[in-house]
Design a protein with these regions (language model features):
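A sequence-level detector for low-complexity, Ser/Thr- and acidic-rich stretches
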Residues: 1-233
């Protein structure tokens, strides 16, 4: 978050409900959600407990309901500006699929705002190994978003082992129609060698990264990125 004042955020780690309500196989049976500011634990939750306060926030932000006795996890926090991490863990000896969500619970209260959100996961070429990150644009006007699939730079810049060597990012609407895709961030998928267009694209993406507090991707890397103006949805 950035700006002045606190920002109210809803965080959820949905596991059991993925299985019971959405028939997701191998859903995580008992997620634990822990919020960090740097290395400091801000709050943690294991079972949301059917809280009336949390239920009201679910409704406010348009999140699907959770069963009052489900073992899903949820937190509502008022966060000062800074970088935070929401980490989902499983009990010892278990694993499964979880949905991690972050909602702006007071979107009409600037100047505090959510600037960017990122997630790290192990991905592969098969559909079951795809990382899916959804987002929603509310209101009545279009908004411009920067979407990046960072793989190689995690290794070269941050020393992360097993970093993906060549990432691919695609954006779909709610009907499943593909809106855009990219494999090499400095090229727009044309398949030619237009250096001037490539440089313009890289400059635009660098400027967008600056505006939302993201680091610059190295020129020539096989990371992927898209800068899109999208209608509400």
């Amino acid at each position: 978050t950035r700006g002045t004042g606190a920002k109210k955020i809803l965080l959820r780690a949905v596991g059991p409900t993925l299985g019971t309500e959405f028939n997701v196989p191998d859903a995580l049976a008992h997620p634990t959600l822990t919020l960090y500011h740097g290395s400091t634990v801000v709050d943690t939750n294991t079972t949301w407990g059917g809280s009336a306060e949390l239920s009201a926030v679910f409704t406010q932000v348009g999140a699907f309901p959770l069963g009052a006795t489900s073992a899903d996890a949820a937190l509502v926090e008022n966060l000062d500006r800074g970088a935070y991490s929401a980490i989902v863990t499983a009990p010892a000896g278990s694993s499964g699929i979880a949905l991690v969500e972050a909602y702006d619970a007071d979107p009409g209260s600037p100047p505090a705002e959510i600037v960017n959100i990122s997630t790290r996961a192990l991905v592969g070429a098969e559909a079951k190994d795809t990382l899916i990150a959804g987002f929603a644009i509310t209101g009545t006007t279009s908004d411009t978003v920067l979407i990046r699939g960072v793989g190689p730079s995690l290794g070269t810049l941050f020393g992360l082992r097993r970093a993906l060597g060549n990432s691919h990012v695609a954006v779909f609407d709610s009907t499943g129609a593909q809106l855009a895709a990219n494999t090499i961030w400095g090229r727009g998928g044309r398949g030619d060698d237009n250096d001037a267009e490539d440089e313009d694209r890289e400059n635009d993406l660098d400027a967008a990264s600056d505006r939302c507090g993201a680091w610059h991707l190295p020129r020539g890397s096989n990371d992927s990125a898209l800068l899109l103006t999208l209608a509400p949805g």
